[in-house]
Amino acid sequence: MSKSENLYSAARELIPGGVNSPVRAFTGVGGTPLFIEKADGAYLYDVDGKAYIDYVGSWGPMVLGHNHPAIRNAVIEAAERGLSFGAPTEMEVKMAELVTNLVPTMDMVRMVNSGTEATMSAIRLARGFTGRDKIIKFEGCYHGHADCLLVKAGSGALTLGQPNSPGVPADFAKHTLTCTYNDLTSVHAAFEQYPQEIACIIVEPVAGNMNCVPPLPEFLPGLRALCDEFGALLIIDEVMTGFRVALAGAQDYYGVVPDLTCLGKIIGGGMPVGAFGGRRDVMDALAPTGPVYQAGTLSGNPIAMAAGFACLNEVAQPGIHETLDELTTRLAEGLLEAAEDANIPLVVNHVGGMFGIFFTDAESVTCYQDVMACDVERFKRFFHLMLEEGVYLAPSAFEAGFMSVAHSEEDINNTIDAARRVFAKL
């Protein structure tokens, strides 16, 4: 047995499923998950000593590559002054100033510890601010594991075939209205049915939890218009897209102005950080200035703030996002060319530093139904053959891939060459 197999066997006796987040268990592709020893740049190294070109990037945060010296040094320096104080620090102020400068729609920001905390808190705030209970989310979109959001969710929920999680009371779920991503008609119908009851829409500007599905041109502006018409708030969940699709996020890339924004992943540089923020009048409704309660023992802790501050300063450097886009486009075009040469039907969606691989005869993939029609069994074979080639993709047909600026042209070319060999076996 390999070291990964031995560790997985031991882990399953101690941890549910052997992992601390379900998709890591390779449930969506089968086999034994890799146990990682270390990572550097664009590469992961497993406990058996094998190196992999990594397109998971810790599920998004590692936009600069693994073990970036600026982030590592910031964490070490902060740790020498103490790990957590439970009191305000200067770095929290500097971090808030940086975030609100980079994302102009955020007048104010509140730091939390995860993307789930960010979305959960933003929805509570929207409900408190509007005095309404119902929310709109989209089929196949994932916004963390809060009860009200585990309704027809994407990400690991799709991987496990459980779009509705047991343990969520029907009385909670009844306030969550699920519409079809990229379909404004379904959203308008929900507002027509509940014109005075919907507090907010929460949406991934690029759906990254049913693989990678960008918005159609009219979709996000249409959501903004419907929120304005019916007095609801628009929450854009940029946990995945923030600082990746563009410096100011997908909202800037697509030209839509939300009322609230949720952030995660890159904002922590690899440490557990989330944030939500937006209009000043809405944010003022948060405790202690307002009646909507939200708190966290480790929110804004000095280690996480130091990591995030260092990461965002690096991400804000000129040329970062142009490089991400160029590398991702090169990979997408190379995969499509290799698949065509092998007569493999393939769609590759990509935007900024995100991409999605779909085995499908369809010309495009734009919604949940398109995603579910793709050939998952072929993806499973593709995943394992690429893994044998030393390329680590997300172990699920329903998860996006992530590029970093640490990936080189050689890495991209080697990945495309590996895909050519794999397509010949499919």
Swiss-Prot record:
Domain of life: Bacteria
UniProt keywords, alphabetically: Cytoplasm, Isomerase, Porphyrin biosynthesis, Pyridoxal phosphate
Catalytic activity as recorded in UniProt: (S)-4-amino-5-oxopentanoate = 5-aminolevulinate
InterPro entries the record matches: 4pyrrol_synth_GluAld_NH2Trfase (IPR004639), Aminotrans_3 (IPR005814), Aminotrans_3_PPA_site (IPR049704), PyrdxlP-dep_Trfase (IPR015424), PyrdxlP-dep_Trfase_major (IPR015421), PyrdxlP-dep_Trfase_small (IPR015422)
GO biological process: protoporphyrinogen IX biosynthetic process
Name by which UniProt lists this protein: Glutamate-1-semialdehyde 2,1-aminomutase
Origin species: Salmonella gallinarum (strain 287/91 / NCTC 13346)
Summary of subunit composition and partner proteins: Homodimer.
Protein family according to the UniProt entry: Belongs to the class-III pyridoxal-phosphate-dependent aminotransferase family. HemL subfamily.
EC number: 5.4.3.8
